[in-house]
């Protein structure tokens, strides 16, 4: 038998918390919440369940998760986002796992995660197909999230298995939320990864993304929400190159201005 610390990230999560927290409470021997500055009723809802969030200014997802894990007193951690809702089969499977012998620390477990966009189960959401199977339960002495600014993953484990059941990932509940995340993801990507500053490459990448993530994936069969996920993939693919190009132009103009000012001052 072994204990599990649940690590949960929140930010303006009032819409989903009443669905997210109760299943996790059935599993948790300890509950760590890291909030990145919610301005809605997120903190109040957490406190109504007897939970006290820790504040950490948001940098990127993996760093937030590792911060939550660092506050865990148990070696085994279940790391979840505040828009991921466990079903009862997953809860029962984890409780059964806890009652057994403690696994080796190089072991990890994956969840079956179904993505919901605008309330509908989708086939794809760039850059993953739905469902996907991220590692969510692992030993913190062996594994941790990597430092990728977007699309981070757990690293360090040697073996993994799937947990029965599934998780509902209730993401992008509105177009406003989708555009906010699209802007945030692409900005962080350009800030922390090297993207070739090319409008031509951006256009080609966007066209390829449209064919792959809208036509070939079958998203076109899903009507309105399929158009949304196809647009998201297309816009994401173009924006990362456009922002890299714009950032590069600003740097070039700044250098040219400094050189011009220096020449005039001589």
List each model region and its residues.
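Conserved donor nucleotide-binding strand/loop of the catalytic core
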Residues: 29, 43-71
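A conserved acidic beta->alpha catalytic loop
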Residues: 23, 27, 35-44, 81
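Short, well-formed alpha-helical segments that are part of the catalytic scaffolds
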Residues: 7-27
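Catalytic-site signature of metal-activated, phosphate-bearing donor transferases
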Residues: 63-69, 76-80, 87-251, 259, ...
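Acidic helix N-cap motif at the loop->helix transition within catalytic regions
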Residues: 18, 40-49, 89
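Cell-envelope/extracellular polymer assembly enzymes that use nucleotide-activated donors
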Residues: 3-5, 30
